[in-house]
Amino acid sequence: MLRNGVQRLYSNIARTDNFKLSSLANGLKVATSNTPGHFSALGLYIDAGSRFEGRNLKGCTHILDRLAFKSTEHVEGRAMAETLELLGGNYQCTSSRENLMYQASVFNQDVGKMLQLMSETVRFPKITEQELQEQKLSAEYEIDEVWMKPELVLPELLHTAAYSGETLGSPLICPRELIPSISKYYLLDYRNKFYTPENTVAAFVGVPHEKALELTEKYLGDWQSTHPPITKKVAQYTGGESCIPPAPVFGNLPELFHIQIGFEGLPIDHPDIYALATLQTLLGGGGSFSAGGPGKGMYSRLYTHVLNQYYFVENCVAFNHSYSDSGIFGISLSCIPQAAPQAVEVIAQQMYNTFANKDLRLTEDEVSRAKNQLKSSLLMNLESKLVELEDMGRQVLMHGRKIPVNEMISKIEDLKPDDISRVAEMIFTGNVNNAGNGKGRATVVMQGDRGSFGDVENVLKAYGLGNSSSSKNDSPKKKGWF
């Protein structure tokens, strides 16, 4: 019965995929999905981000996304804020390593007005000295907050170590020591290089394609580039190690040590990306305490083999960061300080078991369960217009097209346990072959007493993890962003 339900849902998806894509004369792409409803979602997606920041532009992405929807050459800051409130206040600008996203959700009749404000903030920001200083102070506070939360700071350290502080290793959050040097001059230089129509996608959900084209032509059709195209540096994975002091303890919370071990993963457009996503779901994981009650992810490997077996583990979860030409895949673990010497071996065992332990090989049942969980997560997320919008905008920015949902579901359905094991072995033995020709070394970041974690490299080597042929003499240079 459930199987029939899945098949019917699959058929409905195929019939309702009404994606359309056009380009304006200036190179700007317009993507639409005319999903019916009383609300529409729209966004502008810029092919920029922290990975493209040169030495003089470090931190500009972070500050620029905080300066969104402020005063412009044609709209004062107060008028901008008041108009946005009247339109519902559901707007945001977020930055990542590979793009900046200006997004909003409004009533259908307000799409034109919101696009006008978006085009103002993207094309004509005033960037007053007062606004800049306010956002610098806000950034300092934000940095302090990040350093108080291991789940936020460790992924940053992971990227910095994995790529030696360059390209994908450039800090997503502006380093504190660079905040004073961020000026309007550098921000405008960054915008001049990356904010161009050829680097931009205008995406709409719930708006007819012809109307979207008309509005985009009206507000963005006369936008012209003033800078030649930028040659973008390929991300080169190097691997590495980093350790920071223990996090402060508040109230009655326990003191914990944290460790993340990762290897170079796959680019987002790699044919095996669906197998890797399924592997992440299969490993799963979570915390020893679940605020929503028991049951979520109980059958994932990191729950059954780690959280249910080792009392000293507070949190254990698989992570996957995928980008246009590289990625990082691994496992994160938090434990009591006394158990830090066992942490590396616990992680190494779980990685090894996915491809080399014949007694714990991946079964048809657990792979099927992971595939169903991945499909349901994908489909439920896409029920939100804002999620559908972001998915469409980022796909067009990266691939030049939107991959149909039924195509993604079909590729997940076709996976076999051997596919998952093959990809796991490729990742965990350091044999990924990406454009940057990265080394197959592990990336290890820790928060706690470094000596307590022991000889991480030898433990990983004992389990056959990582490519140990890399010489110790070509250790990556340390960058002081953190």
UniProtKB/Swiss-Prot annotation:
Pfam families tied to this protein: Peptidase_M16 (PF00675), Peptidase_M16_C (PF05193)
Targeting signal (transit peptide) range: 1-13
Q: Which UniProt keywords apply?
A: Mitochondrion, Transit peptide
One example of the protein's molecular function in GO is: endopeptidase activator activity
Any GO BP annotation: proteolysis
Chief place where the protein resides: mitochondrion
Query: What is the annotated localization of this protein?
Result: Mitochondrion matrix
Is-annotated flag, keyword Transit peptide?
yes
Role of this protein: Substrate recognition and binding subunit of the essential mitochondrial processing protease (MPP), which cleaves the mitochondrial sequence off newly imported precursors proteins.
Q: Which family does it belong to?
A: Belongs to the peptidase M16 family.
According to UniProt, the name of this protein is Mitochondrial-processing peptidase subunit alpha
Record the organism: Saccharomyces cerevisiae (strain ATCC 204508 / S288c) (Baker's yeast)
